[in-house]
Amino acid sequence: MEGTSFHQASNSMRRNSSVWKKDSGREIFSRSSREEDDEEALRWAALEKLPTFDRLRKGILTASHAGGPINEIDIQKLGFQDTKKLLERLIKVGDDEHEKLLWKLKKRIDRVGIDLPTIEVRFDHLKVEAEVHVGGRALPTFVNFISNFADKFLNTLHLVPNRKKKFTILNDVSGIVKPGRMALLLGPPSSGKTTLLLALAGKLDQELKQTGRVTYNGHGMNEFVPQRTAAYIGQNDVHIGEMTVRETFAYAARFQGVGSRYDMLTELARREKEANIKPDPDIDIFMKAMSTAGEKTNVMTDYILKILGLEVCADTMVGDDMLRGISGGQKKRVTTGEMLVGPSRALFMDEISTGLDSSTTYQIVNSLRNYVHIFNGTALISLLQPAPETFNLFDDIILIAEGEIIYEGPRDHVVEFFETMGFKCPPRKGVADFLQEVTSKKDQMQYWARRDEPYRFIRVREFAEAFQSFHVGRRIGDELALPFDKTKSHPAALTTKKYGVGIKELVKTSFSREYLLMKRNSFVYYFKFGQLLVMAFLTMTLFFRTEMQKKTEVDGSLYTGALFFILMMLMFNGMSELSMTIAKLPVFYKQRDLLFYPAWVYSLPPWLLKIPISFMEAALTTFITYYVIGFDPNVGRLFKQYILLVLMNQMASALFKMVAALGRNMIVANTFGAFAMLVFFALGGVVLSRDDIKKWWIWGYWISPIMYGQNAILANEFFGHSWSRAVENSSETLGVTFLKSRGFLPHAYWYWIGTGALLGFVVLFNFGFTLALTFLNSLGKPQAVIAEEPASDETELQSARSEGVVEAGANKKRGMVLPFEPHSITFDNVVYSVDMPQEMIEQGTQEDRLVLLKGVNGAFRPGVLTALMGVSGAGKTTLMDVLAGRKTGGYIDGNITISGYPKNQQTFARISGYCEQTDIHSPHVTVYESLVYSAWLRLPKEVDKNKRKIFIEEVMELVELTPLRQALVGLPGESGLSTEQRKRLTIAVELVANPSIIFMDEPTSGLDARAAAIVMRTVRNTVDTGRTVVCTIHQPSIDIFEAFDELFLLKRGGEEIYVGPLGHESTHLINYFESIQGINKITEGYNPATWMLEVSTTSQEAALGVDFAQVYKNSELYKRNKELIKELSQPAPGSKDLYFPTQYSQSFLTQCMASLWKQHWSYWRNPPYTAVRFLFTIGIALMFGTMFWDLGGKTKTRQDLSNAMGSMYTAVLFLGLQNAASVQPVVNVERTVFYREQAAGMYSAMPYAFAQVFIEIPYVLVQAIVYGLIVYAMIGFEWTAVKFFWYLFFMYGSFLTFTFYGMMAVAMTPNHHIASVVSSAFYGIWNLFSGFLIPRPSMPVWWEWYYWLCPVAWTLYGLIASQFGDITEPMADSNMSVKQFIREFYGYREGFLGVVAAMNVIFPLLFAVIFAIGIKSFNFQKR
């Protein structure tokens, strides 16, 4: 079709290369002989005669070397090696090769006069608002959670007004993003950058209110599909960890398709044939391969891997929390590449450089620039800290702050605009850094250039208004006033199809990916098989046929118990779908919203592909247990049971997938899952007989899948030959009599009804899963919290809010209220090694140790700020961990002294602080509480409360945290503080310990220029108080680098190559390296840190033939440093070694009190855990109360007792299971904080464990009382004080047992995922041995011992013996009293209650003690 696009002559290209030099267009390979040319010409002539469809799928593949064969190939069968060789020929080494390839593609398109589509994005008077809670109401406390829930409900009914306040994110912004020009989006955190990018890409959250207009080529967003026309590349790296980088790209490419590239190629081939033009064979294959949908080996995938520098890790797993994979920087590039492989024509990229070094960022941005310039692409990219050379690649700049656009237009005029406002960029300052700081209240004054006028703070609003009258602003206003001529929009520019490829291809790709993931997760399936095998073995040996009779109705109860447990085993086996589905949801939401595929395409493959697994799991269960237990020997009945269990397994899998999609996070889904299981379980006909179900709950009986499964499996068994013996005085068989007595449906056809119903549930739940995926979005979006302040000046309020700081006094050196002793640290010939990794031994390495630090020397002094630098892998963090005593493994040699005395880690921990790169804090406390807690535990006992409080206030001012004192810390990337605020909190938490020596690991990583400046100002303030501070730092800007006094530079392999002062404008450092022969001189204005790392690489060493470590050791500087080390290694006259009478600052009791204080706030402000558990308990109590209404007092028949026991058994098992499952993620988060705090010497493990255990006791007590009161009254147990107390006591003990078991499982395993998998096996065994499914007297003698080890068995013993053990009334269907019956049938004696009560205390105590031992003994953090 005329004029369709190769759009982007490939998007692929979309990113590629370097600076511009147009290629002359000569062919890549000149043929070595006329014969080769003739052969190629003949093959090309044959190709030209083919029909268009076939011609576009064929190409001429030339050999890599002269004289090689020339083959005609099918593009869709292009192999991996062919693709690799093709790209090697097209893109040789060097950035400009990418650019040359793009020019060749463009030249081929231009030669036949095809116009490529372009997109101009305009936004006019765009305003975006959110509704947020204000002040203290925004904190997620227990009370607020309940209030907010009630408010939302009442507001929906229009009974109360909305209490949320409007918060403007973007305030009336307008602008144009033009094709063919690279646009950079700059602005401080919370300025609205991400919101603007989302609005322009058509991906804004529906809850946000948007006014104004966004158009593409003059067309409104409703006239095309913006999600497929534009690609939004987000900040968060959301990927499937079990896929490799290449697979991630390949599937993304297959889902997105090729857009209009194929149509463009058709038109291109037609025109070339008409004009008799023969294209370059390699370029021809490249373009055809990029334009062919559905390829498994995609040229685009390999091309983007090459551009992004990901070839080195192409076949490495992406990885996640559980699976080791690629680095953070590589993951960030995968996020970018995933969209670049698609056909989108406009790119909106959000902070794509986080975690990347400046040279990698430069290469990626340069490649994008080449694509944008050559193919007139549209790109708006936000970057955090662009280096000057990267900044200069952009044509246009959009500067945004507080939701207002301050500048938008050519990069060349941006400095001019600020000069008209009176601000000047200093000579050694990057323009990007200047732009981010000049709007900040804290930083603006230093750039004021009008010395004749007094400085006053210029607000963002004033900048925005001034820009409207600036010549660039006026020009943009004029352009926006003229509407875009829609007739000039290329027909292929805007995508109108919802999905990139046809339904058939989408389904095929989705099946392929799901099958791959199932293979990668095969361990889960093997584990489940193993678990089923163990449970099947336990079941068949517990219900052994020699012990089982078929003579009475009591025998029928045992067979019912066995069948019920087999059903439940397969039901619980489906629970693993919950966590596996939730783990993949973030990727699904991202790809669904980007219109990769509809929800049903995602949900269909796991359903169909897991059917064979259901057959295998059911086979494992049925064929092992059937004959050993002694079910009816008919083979037909065996296979009928097998089919039923297959359907049961499928139903459970579908149910838990649906629950996962409805819940969307583990805590909520676990709660939903437990609730669904409870309803189905309690109303399934086993726990509560159908005849006793109240009329208001009978609907629950008829919708319970377990009811259909149970009735079908019982009909299959009890209508068999084994149970056909007639009962005395009755015409009915034993089987029918038993079914009727227990309230089951006594008809053989119920097998077929049950089977059909289960099949229906499988379809229904899978349909529900698909609906939930289609209409629900992910939970937990971060929201702004507005401070509750008088809004007399709205601008001022907004300014304070976005700055996150208020103006403090001038930064002067200051003393602190608490004195401290300055200390120096020296290290001489420090060697650190680890055991040789197994993979290196397998590759033939002879040594048994790998040396990471090779005899490093240095001294860090008070009042001196030292930068610890080096390339990746040089050993920066390793050296810091060794000096700080944070290493948990390896071998350390050498001398380390503190003020001349040998270092002792226990005393050193008291005078040092360590700011880790990952900011680990308890998420549910405020900033102020975090500091109070740290100071409480780390300052000496002599410091009283008032002094401590004053000191905390001083530290908060020093670190600029005063305005954030009541802000909740939150979880990184999810809620609470921003990255930069968390970084300052990390520093403050260490400072309130009043340390003499502070280590900081990457304090500025992941921050924008303004935030980095705030953190560095904090660090500088800290040094100016006379402390010794050492920072590792990665790719700093000039002003950050030159804020340091000294540099400690390591090269790869762990050797120092420069240790000394930087000097004014880094002169000492520059002079040192420039004195080495062959080193390139630094250019004017170039960053000395970047230059220093570039000239000291291993490749430079090889080129110059020198060893920089040896050069340093031969220098005067080294000799001076050795003298300094020698001097500082001698104790000062009259000084004493560090001595503290106790290991920790505070007593054991104080440690316990402080830990408990923090846990109190952590629990109070964690409503997803505490409030949901509370509400869940009330819901379950009301449900049970109404289900078992007034059944507690009925003891006339066995079924009456069975019903009462069922209510207890179900509550103990399910509420307990819910407690254990929900506590595990909470303990797991806090354990990570514990590792940091214990390493800092804040407390011993026991006070922490005590607090974690003790805080649960009141919460669980309230849970037990609430549950007990509601249920006891509604079920109608006997109202005596003793019986009510026993009931509460045993329920409380049971809840505590499960809660502490859940905590113990986390303490003994690396994370809560593994803990939950291990726990599920125990829950199944406890269920089996609880005494409900098979009473203790009926158990084979070889299993009776385990009954006494089962905590659930003791709880049920206590509950039933205390309620019914004293009732001497005779039963209607037995010649025994209630007391005799429960003693004979269940083995329960009232006189044994004292022992039972003791065991009810011992189990929680045992699990709590094991939890404490686990926390103390196991450290799963490897350093």
UniProtKB/Swiss-Prot annotation:
Principal place of residence: membrane
Entry superkingdom: Eukaryota
Residues the record lists as binding ATP 2: 870-877
Keyword line: Abscisic acid signaling pathway, ATP-binding, Cell membrane, Glycoprotein, Membrane, Nucleotide-binding, Phosphoprotein, Plant defense, Repeat, Stress response, Transmembrane, Transmembrane helix, Transport
Regions that span the bilayer: 523-543, 562-582, 611-631, 643-663, 667-687, 696-716, 756-776, 1174-1194, 1207-1227, 1257-1277, 1284-1304, 1314-1334, 1341-1361, 1395-1415
Tissue specificity statement from the Swiss-Prot or TrEMBL entry: Mostly observed in inflorescence meristems relative to cauline leaves and developing siliques. Ubiquitous with higher levels in leaves, stems and flowers. Also present in primary and lateral roots. In seeds, mainly expressed in the embryo and, to a lesser extent, in the endosperm.
Glycosylation: residue positions: 16, 376, 729, 895, 1375
Gene Ontology CC: one annotated term: plasma membrane
InterPro entries named in the record: AAA+_ATPase (IPR003593), ABC2_TM (IPR013525), ABC_trans_N (IPR029481), ABC_transporter-like_ATP-bd (IPR003439), ABCG_dom (IPR043926), ABCG_PDR_2 (IPR034003), P-loop_NTPase (IPR027417), PDR_assoc (IPR013581)
Start and end residues of each stretch annotated as Disordered: 1-36
Domain ABC transmembrane type-2: 505-718, 1150-1364
Sequence ranges assigned to domain ABC transporter in this UniProt record: 154-427, 825-1077
Free-text activity regulation comment from the record: Inhibited by glibenclamide, verapamil and vanadate (ABC transporters inhibitors).
Purpose of the protein: High affinity abscisic acid (ABA) transporter that mediates the import of ABA, with a preference for (+)-ABA, through the plasma membrane, especially in guard cells, and is involved in the intercellular and intracellular ABA signaling pathways leading, for example, to stomatal closure, thus conferring drought tolerance. Together with ABCG30, import into the embryo the ABA delivered from the endosperm via ABCG25 and ABCG31-mediated export to suppress radicle extension and subsequent embryonic growth. May be a general defense protein.
Family: Belongs to the ABC transporter superfamily. ABCG family. PDR (TC 3.A.1.205) subfamily.
Protein name: ABC transporter G family member 40
Source organism (scientific name): Arabidopsis thaliana
Gene behind this protein: ABCG40
